[in-house]
Amino acid sequence: LKCLVTMFLATLFLSFLLIACQSKPAPATPVEPMLRSETYEQAETDWPVLSPLDPPEGLRACCVFGYNLKAEALGIPMPLFGIDNIVEAEKLGEHHYNDSVLGASAALLGISNEKIGLLYTEKGGFIDIAHVRDTADYTLYFFSQIYAHLGQEWVLTLDNELAARKIHFFAFTPPEDPAESYTLSVYLAAKLAFQLAAWHEIAQWYGYQSIPGFSEAVSAFSPEDLYSNLLGARLALTLILQGQASSVSQFSAAIANILPIALHELGAYDRSGTKEMFDQVDGIWWNSYQRISKKFLLLRRNYETQDDRYPLMPFDKEKSALRLSLPESYQHFSLDKLAEFQLWPTDKMKNLPVPQRYWTVKDFPMLAEKAEKQDMKQLLNNK
């Protein structure tokens, strides 16, 4: 226990150091979100573009579904560690691309300039702000890579998540119009960023651990996760098409500006309203008596992995749900013919089945369905 407390205090101290070093995002001209079910947005011109970026340093460390969550490590309760988990739309602070492990820890503890957590919205259900931010960042990252190599055959290799993650880009003739090439790059980037998020949900369920020894099964297929990722992809798509990607600081400021606007458009609840919604689904969607390390703290999951989706809504609130989607094509280009997200076998697959060659997004529904069947069986056995 003394060791765990020491680790906690060390992380806290280093997080404060990081906050002192965080750069302020540049001011941005506010951009209105385009929160319609389908989007046909296009760039007016080929805006100035930043150089190819390094990928974000992992994902932000958030959020298990629920509030006032208690933790344990190696079966030992951590009384000094608790997660409030509720945020409000107008108090989300800044946005920082390429968040470090320490930055994520600071945000999770509530001491960062960038806030993460969950809130409830009338049209989008529960929204996980960390997932919104992560997929927005990955959309920018992929855009910076794709636009620089558009039309070329090449392979982008990412860090492993159980499987070896690779994106194979195929050779093709890009549009002659520079603005159309820009738009095509954005559409493809948003598509791939969402696919990356969907794989992360699958990997978590099958045993992926970003910190060795700490199971992430409690977060796998959380009801709000992929809708939040989809929202992040759509917001980033809008911003990049509006020319907000000439630098990381410009994009970060633009995300900080557009996020509260989008959440209010979705009908964001205040802190007490979100808390009330959590309480209404306690015992149905989550178990407030369980600690974070327990998989079935989460009782309700959403195993759908497609990027055309409704939010999972509690009780009789489905009528107000807003469907969001990403484009399947642009002009005559089918996006799935331009790039393929591939998951190759490794020697550290945990519980993930070994593919004949590699998994693709076409296999995601099958892998998710297997997870759902096993969870349903386990929940029945637990009753």
Q: Where are the predicted features?
A:
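N-terminal secretory signal peptides that target proteins for export/translocation
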Residues: 1-3
